[in-house]
């Protein structure tokens, strides 16, 4: 089927080499202000032909709004988005129309529909994911405005190149913003010299080996990890890097979406070598949903993990998903794996909503959190205090310069010209009746660790939802292989056309959008049963405490 959701339904349509692709969102709330520029920015993060690391199919992926809005405000009627296909070269596929491509759905598609796929991968192409990015980027603006919920995905590994273990743990506790993911994941490539330059200006050779520190590298930057290890530079490293990387001159800007500069350089080197050889590679992407309301998820067959798994596994090339400790948890004892409960005490003045996790609230009692919500830990890949402050990055990846890399809230909303809070008077979602605190005498419990990945018994705990997706190597490779045609005859095949060597750099906005769709539907299902009084969240409690 092409529809996901129970109350909030998203339907996608169109084929990879058809005239257009699109989606319909049904069941979305009325009177929600949507900034179409934010949707377009997420589409831009996903689109092909971004750099030498991605497919050279030149699709601008410009969003076309067909229905569901009065200017920028939803009507409560079906929302329809359309994206034209503009770079279709069908002749690239004519030479192997009778040969099912290994790793693709050509054979199974034929057996199911009795139709040979003459061009591209039709409905089974990764091209379809542009439609869910449009839908999810719309839905997540509502999630952020009403629940302060933010979602970020980044590349954890490509092949055997992965984030350092401590850096990965720190990111799962304090998620980086999308701005930071794109800033630290950007690498300048000087093809003539065969050198790479990372976020901090450090220079590496074609194999990703450190050569020298750059003039713009902040004090404390070391080739060991490619990141600053001490001090608080007076200059803004994010703004400086943006200025350097936005005007590469004779260099090419590569985007990995791996928020660790040294790892990003190694990924670039590896992918370019594989692309030259005509091969492909997969990897792992990590997604973190922050400030998800407590208590959403439906037993037994529609648990939060099950629903997330369903939509994430529907993304082409995704072959697996794990939550929290995942498969590593099988090596742990129950005494180590169990997440113990504690109470949440939100300080009157302290970390802002973004960059503040449940374990941070507990750790603040022991003085382990700095005033800006950052956590100084050895091996972290960035200064969290600086990177999560507003105004530190104009916008490399998505959301306007509120500095969070997430949809704006309140008077910062770009569609709100008056500076007043967005309209929340919709009778179907009455925020004035919403109880943001537990009943008298009860405490909002949180877990001091997060091996469960923010979900227990299929229901959200309020901790960060953390999951990782396993991505297989791209099936279309330019290495000749012996296979069989539809008639059982041996033949040789070398796939031509416009394909990615590795889809990981384009994957984060797809996973972010898919996660938004699931959370949005689950929230509406909970509200339909119990109302907003049963939707406490850490973000709302933080606001009510300060107010």
UniProtKB/Swiss-Prot annotation:
GO terms for cellular component: cytosol. Keywords: Amino-acid biosynthesis, Aromatic amino acid biosynthesis, Cytoplasm, Lyase, Oxidoreductase. It is found in: Cytoplasm, Cytosol. Signal peptide: none annotated. One of its GO terms (biological process) is amino acid biosynthetic process. Bifunctional chorismate synthase and flavin reductase. Catalyzes the conversion of 5-enolpyruvylshikimate 3-phosphate (EPSP) to form chorismate. Acts also as a flavin reductase (FR) able to generate reduced flavin mononucleotide in the presence of NADPH. This is Chorismate synthase. It comes from Plasmodium vivax (strain Salvador I). The lineage of its organism: Eukaryota, Sar, Alveolata, Apicomplexa, Aconoidasida.
């Amino acid at each position: 089927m092409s529809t996901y959701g129970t109350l909030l339904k998203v339907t996608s349509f169109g084929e990879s080499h058809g005239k257009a692709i699109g989606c319909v969102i049904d069941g979305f709330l009325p009177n929600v202000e949507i900034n179409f520029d934010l949707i377009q920015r997420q589409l831009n993060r996903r689109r092909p032909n971004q750099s030498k690391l991605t497919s050279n199919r030149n699709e601008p992926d410009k969003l076309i709004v067909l229905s569901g809005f009065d200017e920028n405000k939803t009507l409560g009627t079906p929302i329809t988005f359309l994206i034209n296909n503009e770079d279709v070269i069908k002749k690239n596929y004519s030479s192997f129309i009778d040969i099912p491509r290994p790793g693709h759905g050509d054979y199974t598609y034929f057996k199911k529909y009795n139709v040979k796929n003459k061009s591209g991968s039709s409905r089974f192409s990764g091209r379809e994911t542009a439609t869910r990015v449009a839908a999810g980027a719309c839905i997540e603006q509502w999630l952020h405005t009403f629940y302060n919920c933010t979602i970020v995905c980044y590349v954890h590994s490509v092949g055997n190149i992965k984030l350092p273990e401590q850096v990965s743990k720190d990111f799962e506790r304090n998620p980086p913003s999308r701005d930071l993911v794109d800033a630290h994941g950007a690498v300048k490539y000087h093809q003539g010299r065969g050198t790479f330059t990372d976020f901090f200006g450090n220079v590496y050779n074609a194999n990703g080996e450190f050569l020298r520190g750059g003039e713009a590298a902040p004090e404390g930057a070391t080739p060991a990890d490619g990141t600053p290890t001490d001090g608080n530079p007076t200059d803004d490293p994010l703004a400086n890097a943006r200025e350097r990387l936005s005007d590469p001159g004779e260099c090419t800007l590569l985007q990995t979406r791996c928020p660790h500069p040294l790892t990003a350089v190694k990924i670039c080197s590896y992918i370019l070598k594989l692309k030259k050889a005509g091969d492909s590679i997969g990897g792992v992407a990590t997604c973190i949903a922050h400030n998800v309301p407590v208590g959403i998820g439906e037993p037994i067959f529609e648990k939060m993990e099950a629903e997330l798994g369903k939509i994430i596994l529907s993304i082409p090339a995704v072959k697996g998903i794990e939550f929290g400790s995942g498969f590593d948890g099988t090596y742990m004892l129950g005494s180590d794996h169990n997440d113990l409960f504690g109470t949440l005490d939100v300080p009157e003045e302290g970390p802002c909503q973004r960059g503040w996790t449940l374990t941070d609230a507990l750790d603040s009692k022991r003085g382990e959190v700095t005033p800006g919500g950052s956590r100084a830990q050895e091996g972290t890949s960035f200064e969290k205090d600086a990177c999560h402050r507003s105004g530190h990055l104009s916008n490399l990846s998505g959301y306007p310069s509120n500095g969070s890399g997430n949809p704006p809230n309140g008077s910062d909303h770009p569609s709100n010209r008056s500076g007043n809070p967005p309209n929340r008077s919709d009778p179907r979602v009455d925020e004035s009746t919403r109880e943001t605190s537990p009943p008298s005498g009860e405490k909002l419990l949180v877990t001091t660790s997060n091996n469960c990945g923010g979900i227990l018994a299929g229901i959200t705990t309020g901790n960060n939802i953390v999951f990782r997706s396993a991505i297989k190597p791209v099936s279309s490779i330019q290495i000749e292989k012996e296979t069989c045609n539809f008639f059982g005859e041996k033949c040789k095949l070398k796939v031509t056309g416009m394909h990615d060597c590795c889809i990981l750099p384009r994957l984060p906005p797809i996973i972010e959008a898919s996660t938004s769709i699931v959370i949005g539907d689950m929230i509406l299902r909970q509200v339909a049963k119990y109302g907003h009084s049963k939707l406490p969240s850490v973000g709302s409690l933080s606001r009510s405490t300060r107010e």
